[in-house]
């Protein structure tokens, strides 16, 4: 009679992203629940379209796409930076903020465009927002949904070498640092994605 190795009992969930920063955050938190995160690129899955106007619709579309392509449970996030003074922009277009204005698609271009848009704006309040969607299968009628919000403000000069996206310009008064100045452990304890992930991980028993 054969005996399964301890690793054989570990579940696998496809991450509907190939972003290295996201992969590190997801892998660290899901590992505490005995779950291995596999980026969709390793399984030959292409990026899904994100045509929707809300974070939750985009997250669900990405999760269903990855699950349909692999036959495995899948998790996706749709996250963005929201600036109330800019009517919630960049919002769902955070990754393509500068590109939508005819500029290149890059973190540097996005950050430069954001600072430019806020040049004459006194209210620099902002928040990172994250919605996570986990589907057991592609047509799951009851996906697990979790969300997280991280409050801060936008600063003109970039600070810090960690993180990605808008992190160098996202200052968190409660921590006295930008998101990019936080080491990964500190960010994983405080960020919007961390809050959403912790809420989702707490419910993982529902998919066993």
Curated annotation (Swiss-Prot):
Lineage: Bacteria, Pseudomonadati, Pseudomonadota, Betaproteobacteria, Burkholderiales
Key words of the record: Hydrolase, Magnesium, Metal-binding, Nucleotide metabolism, Nucleotide-binding
Pfam family, one: Ham1p_like
Protein name from the UniProt record: dITP/XTP pyrophosphatase
Binding site for Mg(2+): 49, 78
Transmembrane segments: none
Function of the molecule: Pyrophosphatase that catalyzes the hydrolysis of nucleoside triphosphates to their monophosphate derivatives, with a high preference for the non-canonical purine nucleotides XTP (xanthosine triphosphate), dITP (deoxyinosine triphosphate) and ITP. Seems to function as a house-cleaning enzyme that removes non-canonical purine nucleotides from the nucleotide pool, thus preventing their incorporation into DNA/RNA and avoiding chromosomal lesions.
Residues that, per the record, bind substrate: 17-22, 79, 164-167, 187, 192-193
Domain of life: Bacteria
Catalytic reaction equation(s): XTP + H2O = XMP + diphosphate + H(+); dITP + H2O = dIMP + diphosphate + H(+); ITP + H2O = IMP + diphosphate + H(+)
Catalytic-site annotation from UniProt: 78 (proton acceptor)
Cofactor annotation: Mg(2+)
Enzyme Commission (EC) number: 3.6.1.66
Gene Ontology biological process terms from the UniProt entry: nucleotide metabolic process; purine nucleoside triphosphate catabolic process
Alphabetized GO MF terms: dITP diphosphatase activity; ITP diphosphatase activity; metal ion binding; nucleotide binding; ribonucleoside triphosphate phosphatase activity; XTP diphosphatase activity
Cofactor comment: Binds 1 Mg(2+) ion per subunit.
Any one GO CC term of the record: cytosol
Subunit structure, as described in the record: Homodimer.
InterPro entries with a match to the protein in the record: dITP/XTP_pyrophosphatase, ITPase-like_fam, RdgB/HAM1
Disulfide bridge positions per record: none
Family label: Belongs to the HAM1 NTPase family.
SUPFAM superfamilies, per database record: ITPase-like
Biological source species: Burkholderia pseudomallei (strain K96243)
């Amino acid at each position: 009679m054969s005996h399964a190795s301890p690793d054989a009992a570990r579940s696998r969930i496809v991450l509907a992203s190939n972003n290295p920063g996201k992969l590190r955050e997801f892998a660290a938190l899901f590992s505490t629940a005995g779950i291995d995160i596999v980026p969709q690129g390793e399984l030959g899955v292409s990026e899904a379209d994100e045509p929707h106007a809300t974070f939750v619709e985009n997250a669900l579309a990405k999760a269903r796409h990855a699950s349909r392509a692999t036959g495995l449970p899948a998790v996706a996030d749709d996250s963005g930076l929201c600036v109330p003074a800019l009517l919630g922009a960049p919002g769902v277009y955070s990754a393509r903020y500068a590109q939508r204005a005819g500029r290149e698609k890059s973190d540097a271009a996005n950050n430069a465009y954001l600072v430019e848009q806020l040049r004459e704006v006194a209210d620099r309040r902002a928040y990172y927002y994250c919605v996570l969607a986990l589907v057991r299968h592609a047509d799951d009628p009851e996906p697990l949904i979790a969300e997280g919000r991280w409050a801060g403000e936008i600063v003109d000069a970039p600070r810090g070498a960690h993180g990605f996206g808008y992190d160098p310009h996202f200052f968190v008064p409660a921590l006295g640092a930008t998101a990019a100045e936080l080491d990964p452990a500190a960010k994983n304890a405080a960020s919007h994605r961390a809050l959403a992930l912790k809420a989702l991980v707490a419910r993982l028993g529902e998919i066993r």
